[in-house]
A protein has these predicted regions:
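Secondary-structure junction/capping motif
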Residues: 1-8, 24, 64, 102, ...
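Short active-site-proximal "capping" loops at secondary-structure junctions
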Residues: 20-25, 49
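Serine-esterase "nucleophile elbow" of acetyl-processing enzymes
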Residues: 1-21, 33-38
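Alpha-helical cap/lid subdomain in secreted, periplasmic
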Residues: 30-188
C-alpha cells in the first residue's frame, strides 16, 4: 500500500508505513514510536482487527432483539473507549491527522456478510464521531473499496483497492485545509 501511495504523491513528498499486520487499537503507541522525525501528517486506519475479534458474537443467539442490541452496545462502548484513548495518543503527536473508516468485509458466506455489514456501522460511527468532533478529515474506505475486485480476500484490499485508497489519501493530503479544523469526507 505504501508503494502505491508513493507513486501518486507529488514529487518530494514521502510516505512511511507504520501499520503492522494483526495490530489492534492498543498497539498504536509502538507504531507511533516508529514514525520518522520528518513526519508531517498521520493517516490512521485502525480498528478492523479489533472488530474481527468480535466476529464470533455474530453467531451468538439472543432471547430478544433488545438483548442482541445490548450485547452489541457493550462491544461498541469498549471499542469507543479504546479508540478515544488511541486517538488521544495520536493527537499528542501534534501533527495533522486523518481517520479512515473500516471497509466492509467481503465474506463468502452470504449470511455472515449481511450480519457483518449490518454490524460494522456501530464501529464506523465511533470513528466518524471522533473525527467530526475534532474537525478532522475522514477517508471513507467503505465508499472507496466498493467493488468485488477491490478485495484480495474477505478482509483485505487488493492491489486495485490499494490503488484507490492511495489515490484518496493523496487527494486528501493535497486538498484538505487542516488548519481550518473542519471535517471533510474523502471518497476518491
Amino acid at each position: 500500500m505504501v508503494r502505491q501511495l508513493r507513486t501518486v504523491l507529488p514529487p518530494g513528498w514521502k510516505a512511511a508505513l507504520l501499520a503492522v499486520d494483526g495490530a489492534r487499537i492498543g498497539d498504536i503507541a509502538g507504531q507511533l514510536r516508529q514514525a520518522p522525525r520528518e513526519t508531517t501528517h498521520l493517516v490512521i486506519s485502525i480498528g478492523g482487527n479489533d472488530v474481527l475479534g468480535h466476529l464470533p458474537v455474530l453467531h451468538d443467539t439472543a432471547n430478544s432483539i433488545a438483548g442482541a442490541l445490548l450485547r452489541l452496545a457493550e462491544i461498541r462502548e469498549g471499542f469507543a473507549h479504546e479508540y478515544r484513548a488511541m486517538f488521544d495518543q495520536v493527537l499528542g503527536r501534534r501533527l495533522p491527522a486523518a481517520l479512515c473508516t473500516i471497509y466492509e468485509p467481503h465474506f463468502p458466506d452470504a449470511q455472515l456478510q449481511r450480519a457483518g455489514v449490518a454490524a460494522l456501522p456501530l464501529f464506523n460511527d465511533v470513528i466518524t464521531r471522533e473525527a467530526f468532533a475534532r474537525g478532522l478529515p475522514v477517508i471513507d474506505l467503505r465508499l472507496i473499496c466498493d467493488r468485488d475486485e477491490d478485495y484480495a480476500n474477505p478482509i483485505e484490499p487488493s492491489a486495485k483497492g490499494g490503488d484507490k485508497i492511495a489515490a484518496a489519501i493523496a487527494h486528501m493530503l493535497a486538498e484538505h485545509a487542516f488548519v481550518a479544523e473542519r471535517s471533510r469526507v474523502f471518497v476518491r
